[in-house]
Regions:
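C-terminal substrate-binding/catalytic lobe of Rossmann-fold NAD(P)-dependent dehydrogenases
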Residues: 169-224
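N-terminal Rossmann-like NAD(P) cofactor-binding subdomain of oxidoreductases
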Residues: 2-182
Length: 224
């Protein structure tokens, strides 16, 4: 029987807790193995890597970087491309733009071996947009590349579906949303904003990319 291996790329704000959750609930989720890729060997990240390995995840690094990690006491089990091609599912949690680059340079190359590739909200165009409980019916077994939309897009889509679409899709005419979030995630020590900041609207039609993503999300259901 084929082993179910989940490979997470990136150990930042999204990647680190996700890897930990997958390890902790491995049996309940029916996962045989969790692997993760770390790009840079950083002293400040050692405790994070040690914890993830202790919880059962296996570390993968770029070919040629093994020595850098070992110098800091981190022992890689896998090489980057090896970890990708042996996985059942890839979850890309890298910063904006990196997921698209990974798709072009690595994921498409191994698309005949890996069942599915998931990327985060910033990777517009990576694949079909998806939000849990919103457009589940739009998913198809042929959808190999999926973009999990951002938290703000999830919020707007959930409110829209609950208030305007639950009974009849024709109820939705227009919606205006204001999203307020904390200054930083706990794992983000830089660029802290100690007071409210209002951002510019970068999308002429929808205002923000979150709203545009929400519209694209509902378009998968044939609504827009």
């Amino acid at each position: 029987m084929e082993r179910k291996i989940v490979h997470v790329v990136g150990t930042g704000t999204i990647g680190e807790p996700l890897i930990g959750l997958l390890c902790d609930y491995e049996d309940k989720l029916g996962i045989d193995e969790v692997t993760f890729h770390k790009n840079s060997a950083l002293r400040d990240d050692r405790s994070k890597v040690f914890d993830l390995v202790k919880r059962g995840a296996r570390l993968a690094v770029d070919d040629g970087k093994e020595r850098d990690f070992k110098k800091l006491g981190m022992d890689p089990d896998l090489e980057k491309e090896e970890a990708i091609k042996r996985a059942s599912v890839i979850i890309d949690c890298t910063p904006k733009g990196v997921g698209q680059s990974n798709k072009l340079n690595f994921y498409e190359k191994f698309s005949d071996k890996v069942k599915g590739f998931l990327a985060q909200g910033s990777e517009d165009g990576f694949g079909k947009k998806y939000a849990r409980g919103i457009n589940d019916s739009a998913l198809d077994s042929k959808d190999q590349f999926i973009q999990i939309v951002s938290c703000n897009t999830h919020n707007m889509a959930c409110i829209t579906k609950t208030l305007a679409l639950h009974e009849d899709p024709e109820n939705l005419i227009e919606g205006n949303y204001v999203c307020i979030r904390r200054a930083n995630d706990l794992s983000q020590p830089d660029n802290f904003i100690p007071s409210p900041q209002v951002g510019n609207h970068t999308n002429e039609k929808y205002g923000t990319h979150h709203a545009a993503d929400a519209a694209s999300l509902f378009s998968t259901l044939g609504m827009i």
